[in-house]
Amino acid sequence: MKKLSSSEIRQMYLDFFHEKGHTIVPSASLVPVDDPTLLWINSGVATMKKYFDGSVVPDNPRMTSSQKSIRTNDIENVGRTARHHTLFEMLGNFSVGDYFKKEAISWAWELLTSPKWFGWDPDKLYMTVYPKDTDAAKFWEATGVKPDHIIKVEDNFWDIGQGPSGPDSEIFYDRGEAFNNLADDDPENYPGGENERYLEVWNIVFSQFNHTPEGTYEPLPRKNIDTGMGLERVVSVFQNAKTNFETDLFLPIIHKTEELSDGKHYGDNAQDDVSFKVIADHARAITFAISDGALPSNEGRGYVIRRLIRRAILHGQKLGLKEAFLDQLVPIVGKIMASHYPDVLKNSAYIEKIVASEESRFNETLNDGLNLLNNLIAETKQTGHDTLAGKDAFKLYDTYGFPFELTKEYAGDEDLDVDEAGFEVEMKAQRDRARNARSSAKSMGVQRSLLIDIKTPSEYVGYDELTNVQGTLNDIIVDETLVDHVDSGQAEMIFSKTPFYAEMGGQVADRGVILDDAGEMVAKVTDVQNAPNKQHLHTVEVLKPMRKDATYTLNVDLAFHNKVEKNHTATHLLDQALRDVLGEHTKQAGSLVEPDYLRFDFTHFGQVTDEELAKVEQIVNDKIWAALPVSAIQTDQETGHKMGAIAVFTEKYGKIVRVVSIGDYSIEFDGGTHVKNSSELGLFKIVSETGIGAGTRRIEAVTSKEAFELLAGEEQTLKQVAAQVKAPKLADTPAKVSQLQADLKAEQQNRASLESRLAKQQAGAVFDQVDDVNGTTLIAQQIEVSGMDQLRQLADTWKTKQYSDVLVLGTVIGEKVNLLVAVSDDKVKAGIKAGDLIKAIAPKVGGGGGGRPTLAQAGGKKPAGLPVALKAAHEWLAEQ
């Protein structure tokens, strides 16, 4: 067996398929782009869906990648098994309508067994196939695989519901009898069974059917190959590691954790080993996720990161790590993965800052969680039960980040069990909620074969020409059918040449009209999208008959187009200004460029202050007024990166890219349209800045005429305010408003002082009226005060002087009622609690309330019920 590092193995796989004509596709971000069906990129094929469903035709139908992925559905198994991980890399080779089973199987065998490549012993390899897939079995035999090493398994069929599906073939490596954890006669002791001896290293999916909405399986117009090889598993084979964790992908993290721990060492005992593994695994996932722009929060993928951080911290405590430690593992992860993911190491300082902040935050939450757990244990014991409720264990897990096994361990120390079945019910409900939140969108579309088959060329000339463009009508589609002519109604059209921009990168499509050779308008263009073979597909409203192969004049709506391109150029200036003010960690997370406004989403940890927003706005306007030239060139990706161009949504770029520069200030990969000079924008104004999710902020802004109109409207509003506050000049308005606020505050203080004196005067009369109820003294009165604050002041006075054992006060303010109950410490010890009393009388005023044993309050909407409530207080005390 060769001795290879994880970096060498990864590169060897990519090099092999590059030799077979595959394009090496860079790993996409873990945060999905334009895919609401996924929380995370969870496989290599997840980034290839647009090719497999036919919505985009790739430049090269053969592709290969090493794709970072995250899965958290089995998070509780991480650290307890040899191969469960949250972050993993999936090596894959893909064919979109090119080669199929024969080549995929032949190349897999060559990579695995050739001395030039992996060089594994053929006798240690086993293959499973779908029983009805006789072709796969035949091709495996043709490569030299022994018939008894080919096993038919009914589950070998890949199907995710509607969309591409097909049989698959799994490849297993026999690690030998030393790894066997089952008896010889165990039904799972075979390649494909649940055992440790036969390790699945590769899965080849033969995507050859469309699973239709009706439940039938129809042959795909273009058959595909989708494979997945877990890098971590393959590395464990090469490095003869008992588990994935004893490889160079994890051991440096484990060794660093050993250094930081309280004298703990990996391998000393199984319980500590689980914690070492969990920390190493989660450190990788946390580091990569934050590097890709996800941030800790209480929702979505941010919640996943927060859970992983908290889980790692809790396992750190088991190893004696009482201080923050997780941030110190970030650079270790960066160094391990630097050869293929240099950005992770580059972003280490930023990631460390986020992790350290989250660790500090959790230390506070942890204490709250432990207090809750101790209270739950005490309550369970007091009620005579021996099992902690599953819903309580789930609350600890969901709110405080306590893993189930940790709750079970703490409960076990107190001789209590935990209702695991009840916990699983709550977990399933949570998973169902998450799944339903993403189920409205299709995970992978059905191939639209009509568009895939249309390969007539279509040249986009909109960067240079916008009107009077002569284009031949090559294709007309009506109701998913190619036709030769159309008289009226909606149709889709492809022209030999077009000035109309197709919606892409957040920029909306152009609008406009189509003229015939007589100059008469025959159609309106309402939308333009990219067809799979990169033509511009025009959605048109046909007004007069149009026919295939005729030549038409295409005119873009210039007013619409010019407003859009101003806003697009503004997004580039805004993107760079945000990096300048907030830091290089900010990344574009989405954009929308409309004619009347622009929307820009970006990643950032924390809120953006008013001062920071003002700086951003000023920078953008300074660059507009500097009259910077805007230019674009076409080049290859490598040259573009060397120029310093910012890549947004990297996976969307081909070999040849367009690089847009605004002076020497901004440079980005971009296919959109722009102004010729920044001065054309005139003015830039931020309308709003908000948070829209976990670590994602959104800015909406306007330019040019819309910016002027916004400022004019704000000026008019300011003039109205100036008139209302009688400011002599517009510039005096803030000072005048400040003076009015100061006067108002002084009046409010005077009123509060008067109310306080009045309350004290009332107190004398109120506290004189004391009733005795079965040995408990009670003051229950309706008084006239301005609100709950005054009631609490009276309660403070009552407590100081201890006028009675129990105090009940009520007041009516308009149509609302405020109630307050106070109980002395002695009576609380005797079992009389303010919270119990308030709950008994609050319904009389149509409300509810609660509080501490010594003080409680309530509100209601039935003033007429206040005397009844005060009487009910007497009755309640009499029953105690």
UniProtKB/Swiss-Prot annotation:
EC class: ligase
Record-level GO BP terms: alanyl-tRNA aminoacylation
Record function comment: Catalyzes the attachment of alanine to tRNA(Ala) in a two-step reaction: alanine is first activated by ATP to form Ala-AMP and then transferred to the acceptor end of tRNA(Ala). Also edits incorrectly charged Ser-tRNA(Ala) and Gly-tRNA(Ala) via its editing domain.
Subcellular location: Cytoplasm
EC number: 6.1.1.7
Annotated SUPFAM superfamilies: Class II aaRS and biotin synthetases, Putative anticodon-binding domain of alanyl-tRNA synthetase (AlaRS), ThrRS/AlaRS common domain, Translation proteins
Chief localisation class: cytoplasm
Protein name, UniProt field: Alanine--tRNA ligase
Protein family (similarity comment): Belongs to the class-II aminoacyl-tRNA synthetase family.
